[in-house]
Structure formats: C-alpha cells, structure tokens
Amino acid sequence: MNAIIMCDEYGCIGIKGDQVIHLKKDLARFKEYTTNKVVICGRKTLETFPKKVPFPNRTTFIVSHSLNKSEFAKYTDRNVIVGSLDEAIMLPRYVNTSDIFVIGGASIYQQLAPFIDKVYLTVVHEPMDNYYARINQDYNFDYYSKSFAPFEIYDKAKDDPINPNFEVIQKFKATDTIKELDQDVEVDFMILRRK
C-alpha cells in the first residue's frame, strides 16, 4: 500500500478537520498518482472532498460504520466501497498493492501504517493542529527518502511564500544498500535523505 500525506514539520495534517492549504501542484500530484487506482479514506476525510463526494476515476474505499454504499448510488461514474478497517486491510488480496493509496485521516494513517510500503509526503511550513505522527516514529521499520526540490508558491490570503518539500519515503529492505538507493544520502534518525 501507499499513502499520500500533507503535513507540517511536526506531523500535523490539518486544522479543524480540513486541509489547511490547497496547493495546485500538490493536488495535481495527488490526481496523477491516484487516478484509476484504489483510495482508502475515513468518513471525516470524505467530508473534506468537494461536495462531500468521492473523486471520479478512482475506486474509493470509505472506512465507516455510519455510511453505506447506497448513499453514493447516484454517482454512477464512481466506484464506491464502504466497509470496515479489517476489510480495507484485506484489499491487497484482490488489488495490486501499488494501486492502493491511503489518503487519510490521521486515524486511518495510523491504523494502516504497518501495511504501507511507500509514502508520498508533502511537507508544508505552516502550522496545523491534527497530529498524525512523525513518519519515522510511527512506522516501526527503516525507510529511505528521496526529496524533491522545494518550489515556491504564494498564499493569496497572506501573500506569503509557501515552500513545501515533496518526498517519497519507502520501506528500507535488508537487501538494499545505500549505494543502490542513492549516492549522496545522509542518515537522519531512521530516515535516509538525499541532500
């Protein structure tokens, strides 16, 4: 499984139940990675979607005890599954794990952490309040990370620059060597990062 996460430097993922910043480049990246794939989210994350409706061109697995699939029947262009966390954990038996993306919220990320092999992370330098966890502390295995160059974008409300970092964090396998991962990495706690 994969996860797509936007958080601040402290591992917080939102403010008052919503994503604090909507970055066009980050949303385009989200769309690119998840189109024609399976996304797993909780009910509260679904409520942050435009019109509280699952995205088109994806199979959306909603982890919920209070919703049922019939509520989404009118959206014929969207394949929606409503089920338990245990059923979400069973998805890799039926779908290639590289085609599954966990998209939130905090509780879903934490509960599915042992099953996640790769994290697509956007780190913003704006404070948030819904604590998720530091990636290297919540997952009990080593990772290596490849950072993408930050880019600058302006927050129109504040006219301040926002410089998020994009990273891909992947399970570190015992058979991998640092040389295979990247030539110029440095150890940062349990994460290996490209300089």
Question: Where do the model's predicted regions map?
Answer:
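Flexible, gly/pro- and Lys/Arg-enriched active-site loops
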Residues: 4-38, 43-195
